[in-house]
């Protein structure tokens, strides 16, 4: 797909390019909080009526001159212009470049400084069931990016009775063998329409956090309600952005 929107946070001087579309089909995708049980995972609704040209993206960013540029939305690496835009942001704007969130399908992008990877599962069968893609692709990409010196962070949605403590522990053990200092975020599952899984309790989040801390040094967790997830600006002023290009 392509980028259809650029937002800007003046306080922290960063811009975000928003993509439409994804390569995974995770049934618990948070996009379903807005699109409903029949919504397509990773695809924002409604579909953008137009996409930004590369020239429009560059013109907008040249005016802003942000210190950091994030690429997000569904799975940002499916945007065909991503490599060109990452290079432009690094060479022309001298900005830090980061995949604000990604499923890890493609981290071999020249001029990319860092990425925040959302791992879906540890066990091979569950990973394939959730995403439709093999686990090895994502984990090998992460290891390779780490070896190349990218600044990486990781996260996992904790879903009791699906992506449970055994999945969390497998991932944390893997990360710790690369570096115990990789930032790791446990996201408490937010129930989406059409699935039977429950939001974890406060105690379950605490147990999951302590388990992760037995492997990693930099662990955080979030336990949002549906209302909080749909309005992140109330909790974090980094989400106070304005649309500067696109719709």
Regions flagged by a language model, labelled:
Residues 37, 41-51, 70, 74, ...:
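Short flexible/disordered coil segments
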Residues 1-51:
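Canonical Radical SAM [4Fe-4S] cluster-binding loop centered on the CxxxCxxC motif
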Residues 53-55:
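Residues that define the transmembrane beta-barrel architecture of outer-membrane proteins
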Residues 1-14, 62-66, 160-247:
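Auxiliary Fe-S-binding modules of radical SAM enzymes
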Residues 17-18, 26-29, 71, 115, ...:
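Generic structural hydrophobic/aromatic packing signal, biased to beta-strands
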Residues 58-199:
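Conserved AdoMet/S-adenosylmethionine-binding subsite of the radical SAM
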Residues 19, 119, 223:
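Pocket-edge structural micro-motifs
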């Amino acid at each position: 797909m392509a980028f259809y929107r650029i937002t800007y946070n003046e306080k922290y001087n960063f811009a975000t390019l928003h993509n439409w579309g994804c390569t995974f089909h995770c049934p618990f995708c948070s996009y379903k909080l807005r699109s409903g049980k029949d919504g397509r995972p990773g695809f924002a609704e409604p579909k953008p009526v137009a996409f930004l040209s590369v020239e429009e993206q560059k013109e907008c960013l040249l005016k802003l001159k942000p210190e950091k540029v994030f690429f997000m939305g569904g799975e940002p690496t499916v945007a065909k212009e991503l490599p060109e835009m990452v290079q432009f942001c690094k060479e022309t704007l001298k900005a830090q470049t980061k995949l604000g969130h990604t499923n890890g399908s493609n981290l071999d992008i020249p001029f990319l400084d860092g990425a925040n990877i959302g791992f879906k599962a540890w066990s091979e069968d569950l990973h394939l069931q959730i995403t439709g893609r093999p686990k090895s692709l994502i984990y090998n990409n992460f290891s390779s990016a780490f070896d190349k010196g990218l600044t990486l962070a990781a996260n996992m949605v904790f879903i009791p009775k699906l992506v449970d403590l055994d999945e969390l522990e497998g991932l944390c053990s893997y990360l710790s063998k690369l570096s115990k200092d990789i930032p790791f975020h446990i996201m408490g599952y937010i129930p989406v329409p059409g699935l039977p899984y429950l939001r974890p309790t406060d105690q379950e989040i605490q147990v999951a956090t302590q388990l992760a801390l037995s492997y990693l040094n930099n662990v955080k967790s979030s336990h949002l309600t549906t209302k909080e997830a749909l309005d992140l600006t109330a909790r974090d002023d980094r989400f106070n952005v304005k649309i500067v290009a696109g719709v």
